[in-house]
């Protein structure tokens, strides 16, 4: 080890070059690192959505949810499985373990879903399996509204033009249209006219299936030519559908237009969206797991001017929400703290060393260690985020320790009469092994945090290894650069300056005061021990009364809300409830914008977001605004309204801070009864502001009983009855038609 330190003291150019290489390579690595709010976590969810138009919740549960659940429960890497069976739709969510391979789990899930596809009802749509890795919330929401275009027209334009452009931005995983209404050929049957003309629902379905048919007619080949054939066997307009013959009574033809109203309209009437009180359609921008959110949003903002320039007259585009505003502010605050911490450390070092030259040597260690650790961050695939920046803030006070020890030891030999060069040689020999021991000890304290499993380990791994890496780099610099700088910069001071003398006198006074207090405490040992016991007891009390949480709630300038209408409600009812919520929110001066998506995730629910004014323009914090809104939402009579802060950490879902899962081998009626009793007890306790049960067992329904004997006498079977009901009431999908290069459903 002596030869190692001697090499750099005797060869100052080598020591300088090595340090410059650390600075250069670390700086280049730092410029290439991603900048994000938190470390990237591979939290992945796989969602299986199956629609069965017109089916009741119990039918969905028994014929769709249960078979798929049983099939995918053994899929690889699953941590938890959650399913929901609602009117028309089954949703199964698989939450994967953090260490699971998402691609392998996706392939395994697809295979198992395909195995049970034949067991599902014939009229049910194919299950849609979607994998989502990374943040569950969008990085940005774009709002599109118009006074002249319908929601379907806006949605169609966004689908054809805007969505594809946004998805070409580097790092964008999906540009999802929310609150829109897709075009469809809607056929509204008139049962009275159908009965008068002797036409059944099955006749209509059969005619549509037979006469709106897409044909691949092939091509005609001759000796020198080859010409494709386009057979016009499909329908392309409401007028063409109206002329479709569905029955013939002698010479009289019954056309579809005789028994139905036909129009090109929205595919469904179960969703709508609002931005600041105006009807709108949103696009949510979701980033890939490895993408830098700041770069992604910068890319989206860069193409927004050209998107706005190409919008049809009367269509406006607005950035409704940008999550990177908080990310940038957070990183700025931590970076500012980093600079402040460095300045404080420099002042403290100067006050204790009392010499500019002695102070300069450990100060050099700060940028070299912080920049040098960037090499390790890049090698490990880490990013610059709040936790790695926090590690750098803490490292500032640690990386100077080794250099200060080296400077003090060498300075002691110089004061004893040795030359700076000889003092550096001897001082480095004496302190080399203690420096190595200090470095390894500090690194060993923090590094084990990086091996913790679960969400905590995924979040704090980068923090631990960044801190340990900075300490290791500082130890290397203390053994290579610091002794060389001491041999060149330090000298024997014959007389101290006035500032050094002032600092020495101040510390001498402090030392004398401490000495007096120390003697006093030794003279009253019983009292000293009693004070110690009291402090320890008070510490225990304070620890027990301190709230515990994985991460504190931060003021992100954004609040979320879920609105749930009664089970009998439709979209009109939900819109009425959200309008009341919008009125209450707009009365809060700290709120700048409000967006709402009605019919999400179902027609009796809505999702809302409240954007707060910039931090400098409001006096109340996000938590205070939430506390002001919650009582107002409890007074909304039409629905249950819950407001909450966005999740503080990636991988968390936000929402209710306390949740209970009730399981039973009995029926759902028993489960609902127990859940409602628990909810009532929670309300009566006075400890909960909002309570909700996700099992809704009070949904009203009409029960249609068929007299099988009478049906047989008139020649009607159960399949005919079921098909007729599904066609008349369920809004069944029949087939597709083409319009301007895109296909739409016939319903």
Where are these regions (language model features)?
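Membrane-proximal extracytoplasmic
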Residues: 1-343, 384, 458, 639, ...
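Signature of alpha-helical transmembrane segments and their immediate interfacial
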Residues: 1-35, 431, 499-550, 610, ...
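Hydrophobic alpha-helical transmembrane segments of multipass membrane transporters and ion channels
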Residues: 14-18, 335-344, 365, 369, ...
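Hydrophobic transmembrane alpha-helices and their membrane-interface caps
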Residues: 25-32, 36-37, 343-412, 419, ...
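C-terminal transmembrane helical bundles of large multi-pass transporters
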Residues: 29, 268, 323, 360, ...
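Helix-loop junctions and hydrophobic alpha-helical segments within the transmembrane domains
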Residues: 320, 327, 331, 407, ...
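Hydrophobic, glycine/alanine-rich multi-pass transmembrane helices and their short helix-loop junctions
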Residues: 347-352, 372-387, 436-487, 540, ...
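Juxtamembrane segments of multi-pass membrane proteins
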Residues: 532-632, 656, 677, 708
């Amino acid at each position: 080890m002596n030869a190692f330190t001697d090499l750099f003291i005797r060869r100052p150019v080598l020591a300088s070059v090595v340090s410059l290489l650390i600075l250069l390579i670390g700086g280049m690595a730092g410029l290439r690192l991603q900048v994000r709010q938190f470390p990237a976590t591979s939290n992945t969810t796989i969602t299986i959505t199956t629609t069965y138009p017109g089916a009741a919740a119990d039918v969905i549960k028994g014929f769709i949810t249960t078979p798929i659940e049983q099939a995918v429960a053994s899929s690889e890497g699953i941590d938890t499985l959650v399913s929901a069976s609602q009117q028309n739709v089954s949703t199964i969510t698989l939450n994967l373990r953090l260490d699971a391979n998402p691609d392998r789990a996706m392939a395994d899930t697809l295979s198992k879903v395909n195995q049970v596809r034949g067991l599902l009802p014939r009229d049910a749509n194919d299950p849609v399996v979607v994998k989502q890795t990374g943040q569950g919330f969008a990085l940005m929401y774009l709002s599109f509204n118009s006074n002249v275009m319908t929601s379907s027209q806006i949605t169609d334009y966004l689908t054809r033009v805007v969505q594809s452009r946004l998805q070409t931005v580097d790092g964008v995983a999906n540009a999802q249209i929310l609150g829109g209404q897709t075009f469809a050929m809607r056929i509204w049957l008139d049962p009275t006219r159908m009965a008068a003309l002797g036409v059944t629902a099955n006749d209509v379905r059969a005619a549509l299936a037979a006469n709106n048919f897409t044909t691949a007619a092939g091509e005609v080949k001759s000796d020198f030519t080859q010409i494709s054939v386009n057979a016009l066997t499909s329908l392309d307009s409401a007028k063409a559908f109206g002329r479709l013959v569905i029955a013939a009574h002698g010479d009289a033809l019954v056309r579809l237009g005789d028994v139905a109203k036909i129009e090109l309209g929205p595919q469904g009437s179960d969703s709508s969206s609002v931005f600041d009180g105006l009807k709108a359609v949103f696009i949510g921008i979701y980033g890939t797991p490895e993408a830098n959110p700041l770069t992604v949003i910068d890319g989206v903002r860069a193409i927004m001017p050209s998107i706005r320039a190409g919008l049809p007259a009367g269509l406006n585009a607005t950035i409704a929400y940008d999550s990177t505003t908080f990310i940038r502010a957070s990183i700025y605050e931590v970076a500012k703290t980093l600079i402040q911490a460095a300045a404080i450390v420099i002042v403290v070092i100067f006050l204790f060393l009392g010499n500019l030259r002695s102070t300069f040597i450990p100060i050099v260690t700060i940028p070299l260690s912080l920049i040098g650790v960037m090499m390790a961050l890049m090698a490990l695939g880490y990013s610059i985020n709040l936790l790695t920046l926090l590690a750098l803030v803490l490292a500032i006070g640690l990386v100077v320790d080794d250099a200060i020890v080296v400077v003090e030891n060498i300075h002691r030999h110089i004061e004893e009469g040795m030359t700076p060069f000889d003092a550096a040689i001897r001082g480095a020999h004496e302190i080399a092994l203690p420096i190595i021991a200090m470095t390894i000890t500090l690194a060993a304290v923090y590094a084990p945090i990086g091996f913790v499993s679960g969400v905590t380990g995924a979040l704090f791994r980068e923090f631990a290894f960044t801190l340990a890496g900075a300490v290791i780099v500082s130890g290397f610099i203390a053994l290579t650069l610091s002794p060389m700088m001491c041999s060149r910069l330090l000298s024997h001071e014959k007389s101290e300056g006035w500032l050094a003398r002032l600092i020495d006198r101040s510390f001498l006074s402090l030392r004398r005061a401490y000495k007096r207090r120390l003697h006093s405490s030794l003279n009253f040992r019983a009292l000293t021990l009693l004070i110690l016991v009291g402090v320890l007891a008070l510490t225990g009390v304070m620890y027990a009364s301190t709230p515990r949480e994985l991460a504190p709630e931060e003021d992100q300038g954004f609040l979320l809300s879920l609105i749930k209408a009664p089970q009998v409600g439709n979209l009109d009812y939900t819109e009425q409830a959200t309008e009341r919520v919008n009125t209450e929110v707009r009365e809060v001066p700290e709120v700048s914008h409000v967006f709402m998506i009605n019919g999400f995730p179902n027609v009796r629910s809505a999702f809302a977001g409240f954007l707060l004014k910039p931090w400098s323009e409001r006096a109340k914090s996000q938590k205070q605004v939430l506390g002001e809104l919650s009582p107002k939402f409890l007074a909304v009579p039409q629905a249950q309204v819950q407001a909450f802060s966005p999740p503080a950490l990636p991988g968390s879902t936000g929402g209710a801070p306390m949740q209970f899962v009730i399981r039973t081998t009995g029926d759902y009626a028993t489960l609902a009864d127990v859940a409602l009793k628990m909810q009532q007890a929670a309300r009566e306790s006075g400890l909960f502001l909002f309570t909700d049960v996700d099992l809704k067992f009070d949904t009203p329904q009409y029960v249609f009983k068929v007299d099988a004997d009478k049906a047989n006498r008139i020649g009607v079977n159960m399949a005919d009855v079921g098909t007729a009901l599904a066609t008349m009431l369920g809004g069944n999908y029949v087939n597709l038609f083409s319009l301007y290069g895109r296909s739409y459903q016939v319903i």
